[in-house]
């Protein structure tokens, strides 16, 4: 009995330590957002201490930002770029995953090995070559070309995830569809793809967030101010921080720019976690 009580006591102490560590981690994660928001709401005369909460909340930076056209151009370009990236990557990766799942074992193994080698290569290594090709073919300042390029980088890993999910779908469904006269394409789009809705929704969210936050490729390939994404608008705002007034405006730009991503992730985080758990179990 004493041994049980001692174990319960140790368990309670352990839970308290977990709680304390969790609070510290949450504080560290939330602190940059607190600084970002409070700096964006400060008056020019209220920058003596940047750690404390502002004396008066000043919304002028947000009003000025939202009245201008630059941030809205950035939103439009980011939506086009992210949407196209999601569409291209989901379609190509799901079809590739289906082909790998239903293909011959030797061919699938060889392609998976090539995929793993591609995934292991850091994207920064191919940056110079990619940039040269895009210039040669006149594809700079082109959101569609940038979307294809971004999607191509994510297809190997995404198709691998789709393959694991499709492996859990009985082959008998394919055979029944073939007996009814359906071809490979019809079988995939009418039978298999609807079964992949949970992972498709989750992957679409993750791909969209990744494209929205993509900085390196848009920085090199989008030089036209009319083609800049939100991330590049934020970069431009911080590059002009010559004083406290400009810093407050830059923080306001950053807050508005990242807000859609945070809202989407908070609303759909349960689906994302459930899908990732399901993927690990199926894998």
Annotate each predicted stretch with a short phrase.
Residues 1-5:
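N-terminal Lys/Arg-rich, disordered targeting/topogenic segments
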Residues 6-10, 14-283:
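A structural signal for multi-pass alpha-helical bundles of membrane permease subunits
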């Amino acid at each position: 009995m004493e041994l049980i009580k001692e174990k319960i006591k140790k368990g309670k102490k352990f839970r308290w330590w977990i709680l304390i560590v969790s609070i510290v981690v949450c504080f560290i994660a939330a602190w940059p957002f607190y600084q970002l928001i409070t700096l964006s709401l400060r008056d020019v005369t209220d920058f003596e201490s940047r750690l404390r909460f502002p004396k008066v909340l000043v919304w002028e930076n947000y009003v000025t930002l939202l009245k201008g056209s630059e941030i809205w151009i950035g939103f439009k370009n980011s939506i086009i770029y992210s949407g196209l990236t999601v569409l291209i990557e989901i379609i190509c990766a799901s079809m590739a995953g289906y082909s790998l799942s239903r293909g011959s074992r030797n061919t699938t193994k060889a392609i998976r090995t090539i995929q793993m080698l591609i995934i292991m290569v850091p994207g920064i290594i191919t940056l110079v070559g990619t940039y040269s090709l895009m210039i040669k073919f006149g594809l700079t300042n082109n959101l569609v070309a940038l979307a294809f390029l971004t999607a191509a980088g994510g297809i190997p890993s995404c198709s691998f995830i789709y393959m694991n999910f499709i492996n859990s779908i009985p082959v008998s469904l394919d055979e029944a569809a073939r007996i009814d006269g359906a071809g490979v394409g019809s079988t995939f789009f009418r039978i298999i793809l609807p079964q992949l809705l949970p992972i498709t929704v989750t992957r679409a969210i993750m791909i969209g967030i990744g494209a929205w936050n993509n900085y390196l490729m848009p920085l090199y390939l989008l030089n036209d101010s009319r083609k800049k994404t939100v991330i590049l608008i934020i970069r431009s705002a911080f590059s002009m921080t010559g004083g406290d007034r400009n810093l407050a405006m830059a923080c306001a730009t950053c807050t508005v720019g990242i807000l859609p991503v945070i809202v989407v992730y908070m609303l759909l985080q349960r689906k994302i976690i459930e899908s990732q758990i399901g993927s690990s179990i199926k894998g």
